[in-house]
Amino acid sequence: MADSSSDKEKKENNKQPVYRGVRMRSWGKWVSEIREPRKKSRIWLGTFPTAEMAMRAHDVAAMSIKGTSAILNFPELSKLLPRPVSLSPRDVRAAATKAALMDFDTTAFRSDTETSETTTSNKMSESSESNETVSFSSSSWSSVTSIEESTVSDDLDEIVKLPSLGTSLNESNEFVIFDSLEDLVYMPRWLSGTEEEVFTYNNNDSSLNYSSVFESWKHFP
C-alpha cells in the first residue's frame, strides 16, 4: 500500500501543467488546435517552441470562434491580441501565429497588472481620505469661526451699554452738556444790546432810564 501511494505522488509530480488547447509533443515542441463550433473537425494552429506561444495562439482562435464565452489561458491579454480578418481556418491560423510571435513576458505582465491595480486602488483610497479630511477641516473651521463671532458679540453687548435717549430733556435722567454759556443761560436783551439801546422799566407810572448806567460802564478798565 505504501509503494502504491508513493507511485501516485511521483506521477502527480511528474505531470505537466494543463493548458487549454495545447499539447506537448514527445520531442519537446508544443502544438495548438481548436475544434470548430458544431463540427467534429479541428483547426490546426501550428507547432511552437514554448507553451506560452501555443497558449496565445489558442486564445486568439477561441475568442474569434466562441466570443465572450471562450475560456482563455491569458484573459489579461485579451485586449492586446490580434483578431482574424474572417472566421475561415486560414485567417484564424494567421492571427494565431501572429499572437504567438508577439513578445509577451506573461509573468512580468501579470505582476505589472496587479501592481497597477493596487496602485490605482491606493490612490483612490488616499483621494477619498483627503476629501474627507478637507471636508472635516472646513466644517470644523466654520464651527470655530461661528463660535468666536458669537462670543465677541456677547462680550460687546456686556461691555458697551449705550444710554437711552428720551424724547425730551425732561424725560431723560442723563447729563446734558452745553457747548457754551449762551445755550444754558438766557441773556436779556438789555444786557446783550449796544450802548445806544435803552431799557425802560415802568412801575406805577414811574420810568427809569438806564442809559446813564451803560454810559458809566465805559469808564471801567
Swiss-Prot record:
Residues 18-75 bind DNA. Residues 111-134 are annotated as: Disordered. One of its GO terms (cellular component) is nucleus. Residues 116-134 have a biased composition (Low complexity). One of its GO terms (molecular function) is DNA-binding transcription factor activity. Its main location: nucleus. One of its GO terms (biological process) is ethylene-activated signaling pathway. Keywords: Activator, DNA-binding, Ethylene signaling pathway, Nucleus, Transcription, Transcription regulation. It comes from the Eukaryota. InterPro entries: AP2/ERF_dom, AP2/ERF_dom_sf, AP2/ERF_TF_ERF_subfamily, DNA-bd_dom_sf. Probably acts as a transcriptional activator. Binds to the GCC-box pathogenesis-related promoter element. May be involved in the regulation of gene expression by stress factors and by components of stress signal transduction pathways. PANTHER family: ETHYLENE-RESPONSIVE TRANSCRIPTION FACTOR ERF042-RELATED (PTHR31985), ETHYLENE-RESPONSIVE TRANSCRIPTION FACTOR ERF043 (PTHR31985:SF241). Belongs to the AP2/ERF transcription factor family. ERF subfamily. This is Ethylene-responsive transcription factor ERF043. It comes from Arabidopsis thaliana.
